[in-house]
Amino acid sequence: SKLCQKDTDARWMTKAGERHYGFKDHINADEKTKLITKYSVTSAVPHDSTEIKNLIDKSDNRLHGDSAYRSKEIEEHLKISECESFVHEKGYRGNPLTDIQKESNNKKSKIRARVEHIFGFMTNSMNNALFMRSIGIKRIKESIGLLNLTYNLFRFEQLIRLEKVKI
């Protein structure tokens, strides 16, 4: 009976010294409209970069991401998908970023921040909607899918009201 109250799909992970339990919503969003175009749900453990292949395809032409997305494997996948990389450059011990690289990362951050606005909206304006109490990845995937759809409806209404999109 205890097993039916326990989520065997969810996992614990630590990020910046804070422990998190549950699942992650990985999204692909349009950089101009901030609408979610694709999403993927995983337990909290896998690194964000592992889902990139499920979110990027030939219809995408640019990837904006932090330095966690910089790897040879991801760069190869982006070439195959004909997607241009705007991923932040990493500094290493003994090989820090140059001023040009820092400036380049700063420009990339302005666009990448638009994705963070989506999660901020879900947390602040949608009553902390990312905090879900469901058991099982199937239910969580359905809930997150509906959450992403609801966000898109809010955003679409805003785009129409601000006359950014014409019907």
Residue ranges and their predicted role:
Residues D60, E82, K141-I144:
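Active-site lining segments that contact anionic ligands and/or coordinate catalytic metals
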Residues S1-K79:
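Polybasic low-complexity intrinsically disordered regions
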Residues V41, E89-R93:
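Short, acidic/turn-prone active-site loops that include or flank metal/cofactor-
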Residues E103-I167:
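Basic, amphipathic alpha-helical segments enriched in Lys/Arg and hydrophobic/aromatic residues
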Residues T50, E73, G94-Q101:
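Short, charged, surface-exposed secondary-structure boundary motifs
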Residues S67, E89-K90, H117:
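Short secondary-structure boundary segments
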Residues S81-E89:
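Short hydrophobic/aromatic-enriched beta-strand-loop microsegments
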Residues R62-H64, F86-V87, L162:
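Acidic/polar loop patches that form or flank catalytic/metal-binding clefts of enzymes
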